[in-house]
Regions:
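Short acidic-glycine-tyrosine-enriched beta hairpin
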Residues: 69-83
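Conserved GNAT-family N-acetyltransferase fold
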Residues: 56, 80, 101
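A hydrophobic/aromatic-rich effector-binding and dimerization subdomain
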Residues: 2-24, 83-137
């Protein structure tokens, strides 16, 4: 199956996007600031990819995660880091909830000028195939 390319639209003036859902991965809201949200159509329940790195925390529900060529389960408390352009899909048979942060900092972005961020390159390199942390720590 061919993955759908999702075009992530950052809110004006923002360097990353924060998403939240409380029932369905199709019914998502973008958090714009304190008390401000905007509805967006989520693609999490389709096989898709985007150029942004994504960090997703599941706060409720459970299901099956498809990330690249790996298939596994997810449940509340799980954290998943997805590298750029990594195809993924979350399948649930009931309600789920969670938060996602999506960002894209190309090589030329000023964030890489900070010395403390250089070590993040190794983390993002490992996330090219996805990283999954299970449950509460």
């Amino acid at each position: 199956m061919k993955a759908i390319r999702e075009k992530v639209e950052l809110p004006e003036g923002h360097s990353f996007r924060v998403l939240r859902w409380s029932k369905s991965l199709r019914d998502v809201e973008c958090i714009l600031g304190p008390g401000r949200t905007q509805p967006v159509q989520g693609e999490g329940d389709h096989w898709h990819f985007h150029k942004e790195v994504e960090l997703t925390l599941f706060t409720g529900g459970e299901g099956t995660r498809f990330v690249g060529d790996a298939i596994g389960t997810f449940a509340a408390g799980d954290l998943v880091l997805l590298g750029e352009r990594l195809p993924h899909h979350w399948h649930t048979s009931a309600a789920s909830s969670g938060l996602s942060i999506q960002w894209h900092f190309p090589e030329s972005h000023p964030v890489w000028a900070f010395p403390e961020n250089l070590e993040l390159r190794e983390l993002f390199k490992r996330a090219e195939r996805g990283l999954h942390l299970r449950g509460r720590t």
